[in-house]
Structure formats: C-alpha cells, structure tokens
C-alpha cells in the first residue's frame, strides 16, 4: 500500500514536516503501508511530537518498519553520552585510574622536555651561526658614495662630446658592475664548520641538520658556493645524510674542487649504492680528472636507470669523444715504441718487452720461452675460471685501478681442463702450440683469457671484455667440442658487462652461456643481477629461485629472493606469483656443490710432475662421465643402472654430497627405503643444511612407516625453504597417516604382516623389509620398471583412495599410467567428481595420461554409467593443456576417441542428448 492509495479526501490537513496527510497517522494505514520511505517519515513525525504524543502508535510504527527494513536508519536511536553513573564502580575506577596515569605521564614528559631545553640550548648558543642582518648584505660601493662632494661639478662643454668613446664607457660600466658585485665573505671565517651536538636527541639533530642544509640551499641558489659548502658541512657534522653529501659535492663541483667532490660522491654511494645524482656527479669529477673510462661506467649506470637523462647523455657523448681522441693519440705513440722494440733483437730485456708488446694486441713475433713451456701450459690452454661466487668475488669496493700485471702464465686465473679440450682449444686458437712459445701469445685463447682475468682483477673491465671477446672469436669455430669453455668465456664477459653497467649485453652473454651449459650457477646469478638492475624483478626472481634449487645455502640468492618478493608484493599485490613466468625445474642430476679434484691436487702438489696432474684430470673425467651417465639413466627412469653409476662415482670421491642425494633418489624410486635413509644420513654429515637430503630422508622414513621421524624431517625442510609445496603436501599426508596409525594400530599390523608375506613370495630376497601397504605415491608414480619388478600374475592391486588435491591425483594417475592399469583408472574416475577433473589435472595433462583416461572410459566405465562418461569428457575438455593435447595425439588415438563418442551416442540416456554429444565432439575437433 502506498500514499497514492489513500488520497486526502477528508481534508484534515497535512503535517508541517514532510507534508504527510494527518489521516496517515493511523494504525490501519501504517499496518497496510509497504512504502519504507513513507513509513520512515511517519515515524519521524510521531517521534517529534508536533502532532501529539502517541507512544503506542510510535511503537507500532517502529515494529512494522523493522519488519519491512531491519537496517533502516530511522530505527536508530540517539544514545546519551556515558557518565560515571553508566558504569559499575569497578569499571569507573579502572577508567579513572587510566586517565590519571596518562595525565601524570604527559606531565613528566613535558617536564623532561622543558628541563632538556633549558639545560641544552644555552650551551649551544655560542655555537650557533650569527643571525643574518644588514652586515651580511652586499656592500655596493659603500665607500665610494659615502662622502658628499665638497664642490659641484661644472657642466661640460659640448665640444667634449666629440672625444666621447662609447666602447670605453661601456667597458667602464661593466668593470664597475663587477666591482659592485664582489661578495663580502669575511663573515665565513667566523662560522664554525662543526656543530656541537652533545646531549641532543636524534630528533633535535635531524632538525639542526635540516636547518643548516636549507641555509646551504639558499646560499647555493644565490651563487655563494663557498658559503653553501660551509653550511652543508655544518649539516653533515650534526647528522650525516645522503642529501647533504650530494649537495656539498655539487657545490664543490661549482668551485672546481674535484677531489673533495669525488670524496663526497663516494660517501653517498657507500650510504646508498646506485644513487643516480652521486653517480652523475662522480662521473663529472672523473671527466675533469681525465679518468674517462671510469666516467663512462658511471654514466652508463645512470642511463640504465634513467634512459632519458639529457645531462648524462650529453656528458657521455663528450667523454666518449675525449676517449676516442686519447686512444688515437696512444695508438700513435705505441706504434712508435713497437718499431723501436723490433729493431733491437738481442737486447737483454727482449723477452719482457715483446711480452708487453703482444699483450697490447699487436706485433707478429712471440716471446722467447723454453721449449717445455708450451707443453707445460698445454693441459690448461682453456681452463675453467676459479669457482668464486659472484657475491664474494665481485662484492665490496672496486679494486684499485691500474695497469694489469705483465708476464703472467695462463694458470694465473684459470683451473685445469682435460687434454682433449686443451688440444681443441689450441687448434681453434690458430696453432698456438705450433711455436715454442705459444703459451702466452695473442692468438692463444688461454693467453687471452689469462690476460682478461688479470685485467678484470685490476678493475679494467672494458679491456678484459675485449680479451674475452677475442678468445670467444678464436674458439667458436671449434663448435660443441669445447662448449663448457665457451660457456665460461661468455660468463666472464657477462661479468665485465655487469660491472660496466651494460645489463643488456650481460643478459645476452648469460643466455649464450646457459645454452652451452644449462643450469650453470654463475650465469644465472649474473643474469639475475642484470634483470634486477633493469627493474625486471619477475625475471630476476625466477633466476634466483633456479639458483636456490641448485644450492639452497647460497646466502646471496636467499637475500635477493626475500628482497624481490617484497618488491613484487608491493608492485603486483598478493597474486604476484601468478604473473611470474614458470620457474624451470632443475634436474636431480645437477650437483648441489661443485667438486674440482684437479684444482685440489694442484693446490696441494704445486711442484709435482705432470703425471700427477694427468692422474687428477683422468679421475675428474671419469667421475664426471659416470655422474652424467647416472643422470641420464635417472632421466630415462632406469634407476638400477643409475644406482651402479653413482656407486662407482663414490668410489672415486666419497665426499660429494650430490652423489649421495642422487643415489638416495634412486633407492626411493626402487622402494629401498633403508638404503635411501643411509645415503641421506651421509649427505647430511657432509652438508647439514641440505634440503634435498632432508626431504628424501623424510620420504624414506615414510616408506619405513616411521611417520614421526618423517614428520620431523619435513618440518626441517619447510623451515629451511618454506616455498616447497611438495613438502607441505607430504606433511599433511604423513600427519594423516600418523593419526590413522594411532587409531587403527591392530588392523594395520595385520595388514602389514599379510602384505610382507606377499612381497616375499613375489619378489624374493631383494627387498625383504619393504612395506608395500603404505608405499608413497611418489615411488609408484616414478617407477618405470613396475612391470619388470612384478610378475604378470601378481594379484596385488594399487589401493586407490579419493584424491583431495591435485598433488594426490597426480601421484595416483602417474602410478596408474606406469602400470597401464585401465581398471584402476576407471575406478579412480568413478570416485572423482567430474567438475574437479580440470583442477586435479592442472597443467599436467600429458599424452599417456590422456590416452589412459580415454581407454578407461571406453572399456570399463561406459557400460556402467554413460552419464558419468559424458560428464568426464565434458570437463576433460576444460583442462588447461587440452587444446594442445589434441594437436599432439596420433591418428589411432583420434579413432579411439571417435569410437568412444559412437558408443556414447548408441547408449540411451536421459542426462544428455545427441545434440549435446555433437557439440562435445566439436570440442574434441572430430
């Protein structure tokens, strides 16, 4: 009922407020009225009492309005402010006590501040700078105009205008102006450069420093740079800040005090690495000190951060022009020196000079060396660079810049490699071994690399990059035979580019190095740093996470991941992980730690004969070959052969943690849990924080039904790396099994005894202690040789429970796919809700899994429940990789799908029609 249903026919008038007809203030009208807004107006009029006080009618209106609109604002009632009478005695005593204690604390704080002001600031009055007054203004010719002329000047004759020289008079005016603008700086000597901050709080120091800095800014803007330096110095003495150092550096540049400005810039970069203003100002000081290469580096870093910085672009062009001019001049001088060296053939220091000559990149002659030097250097012609982490080798202050040490042998910055690679490198180097002194020549890749290492250590990164580029050019024709050596050279050149600020060049070289040697730690780290410098935080995060898969104990990568995760959270919100590119899974074959027996042998037996070196190289080669064969066997799921390969590796070197963890993985795949646990124990003795060892030992304990120990190890894994989702899922599974074991211990024991007897009959004495009842799904999923380990008549079937998440479903379906068990797969589909199928499959839909699902639906499920088959086919088409899978299946598999749809069409059912089947066939591109 609305207001239009009751027109004002009786003429009783309307209310003053809202103009409501009087007859609407009635029980019957209010009871039938459904207009909430009108009822609110009526209630407002009744409460105001302008038409009389009707408590029952008001209450009735409130109840009716509450029934129609419980959230109506008109139902709210004003509540008076609480007083002491509103509380109990205990409550009021507590409130009153809190207020009194707060008042007393505030008074104490005020007294402290007052006492501090009266005690501290009088002592500082002597140290404060003078108040600016008339005496600090510019003295514009005060003495010249202070005295009155005693006699009036007589007017000049008109003839004197003929002698008037306009140019001279203009010159006098200019000189007079310069004299007038001389600033009186006598007051600067009275200002002390330091402020006494004894007894001041941090807030007061900050206030004083800010005030002095603002004074310096005023002086700088007025052109008085000396006064600006003075006030900036006072600000720094009160509280050193990046802004004050930066401003003082700019003022020093204006005064052309290059050394002071350089020191201030260095201080800024210590406090805030990567500060753009400091880099730009340090580049200016480098330019005026004729340190052009250093200026180029700083300007490149500025342009990487701010590509549109016009001042940096202009300065860089000037520096590059000066650098080209200086290089042209130095080349002319060098050529003259080389002519002198070539003329003197029998000088005593010929060897040293010719060595310098070839290091400079010119000349055709080689330095005279003993005949054995080339043979001694041959095994390490293209050795590996020393295995130092980027954070340690390149962190800290920049090394002192200077000329590289001359006359170094190729071993100075390189590890040893196999003779086969050495010979390949020598062949690629253009016959470096063809001359007696081919160990250090410019055509020798090892010599170029050694020179590059020395230049890098001395801080000459551009020259080092040139040497590495020359070595790469010599080795590239050799092809994949020396891929590892080329990868090292690309990685070294990437380090040079990273130091120079050429991040794009660094990324390109790291990509090339990773193509030649996948999952190499140094290129991954350097590429991550370059991405982070370019503010491509997502790509940097992925690279750091990949590095942590190789070595989880690397502190540099851990810190970077934590820092980047916070940045990405701020940029992309809580769902930032969804925007990342997928993190590549590092194969189990990639070792956690690098081992270099040849390097150890050289460090211990530096003076041994070449036969000992050859033995170390042979051991390393054998070890590496066996490990790679074992890794390949793991990739092929041939775990027994991989087991023997890793065991052979441990005979050569039993201190390699990665071999123990890899062999433990093989034992887990073969369900030899006790042996897997022992290998994990050995790995943890070598590296007590190894995540893989803890995780695999937890799986071994789970297989041995030691759920409590498995729980402890999984908690350690999550503590070391909370991002491992598999560990969290395993933790949930083990917790569930532990609770189940506590509840049904007698039944579990009977079941266990019965299954042990079956295992002894079927599998003999190979695995006497294997508990098959609680075999981990990971073991079943990854066991490719399932058919070979069981006889075809084996009656044991895989126990299948309803999966709760994608991980459990994936483990079960992988195990079924390995066993080709269509009946069990049909049972799994029967207990799985079709709508959950896309979520469970996730992005793991593979060809063999897809074929197994289709075969199970066709052979085992269509006769029992056609509607369930239709639902599964419908939701299977919504899986992530479904469209891609359709492009990869064979013609025979397509015919199998067509037969399934034909059987589905021939089966009558009320849950779907022929049109539905035809539409679904179009989804399957049939």
Curated annotation (Swiss-Prot):
Biased composition (Basic and acidic residues): 352-368, 758-769, 784-799
Compartment(s): Cytoplasm; Dynein axonemal particle
Physiological role: May play a role in the cytoplasmic assembly of the ciliary dynein arms. May play a role in fertilization. Binds GTP and has GTPase activity.
Primary localisation category: cytoplasm
GO annotations of cellular component type: cilium; cytoplasm; cytosol; dynein axonemal particle; nucleoplasm; protein folding chaperone complex
Composition-biased stretches (Gly residues): 428-441
Residue numbers binding GTP: 781-788
Residue ranges with Low complexity bias: 369-379
One Gene Ontology molecular-function label: hydrolase activity
SMART domains on file: TPR
Modification sites for Phosphoserine: 347, 354, 423, 791
Misc remark: Antibodies against SPAG1 interfere with fertilization.
Region named Disordered: 318-452, 758-801
Pfam families (UniProt xref): RPAP3_C, TPR_1, TPR_8
Linked pathology: Ciliary dyskinesia, primary, 28: A disorder characterized by abnormalities of motile cilia. Respiratory infections leading to chronic inflammation and bronchiectasis are recurrent, due to defects in the respiratory cilia. Patients may exhibit randomization of left-right body asymmetry and situs inversus, due to dysfunction of monocilia at the embryonic node. Primary ciliary dyskinesia associated with situs inversus is referred to as Kartagener syndrome.
Record's keyword annotation contains NADP: no
Tissue expression per record: Present in most tissues, including lung, with the strongest expression in brain, colon, kidney, and testis. In sperm and testis, detected in particular in pachytene primary spermatocytes. Up-regulated in pancreatic tumor tissues and not in normal pancreatic tissue.
Repeat positions for TPR: 209-242, 244-275, 276-309, 445-478, 487-520, 522-554, 623-656, 657-690, 692-724
This protein's record includes keyword GTP-binding: yes
One GO biological process term: axonemal dynein complex assembly
Keywords: Ciliopathy, Cytoplasm, Fertilization, GTP-binding, Hydrolase, Kartagener syndrome, Nucleotide-binding, Phosphoprotein, Primary ciliary dyskinesia, Repeat, TPR repeat
Protein name as catalogued: Sperm-associated antigen 1
PROSITE patterns: TPR, TPR_REGION
InterPro entries associated with the record: CiliaryAsmbly_MitoImport (IPR051982), RPAP3-like_C (IPR025986), TPR-like_helical_dom_sf (IPR011990), TPR_rpt (IPR019734)
PANTHER family named in the record: RNA (RNA) POLYMERASE II ASSOCIATED PROTEIN HOMOLOG, SPERM-ASSOCIATED ANTIGEN 1
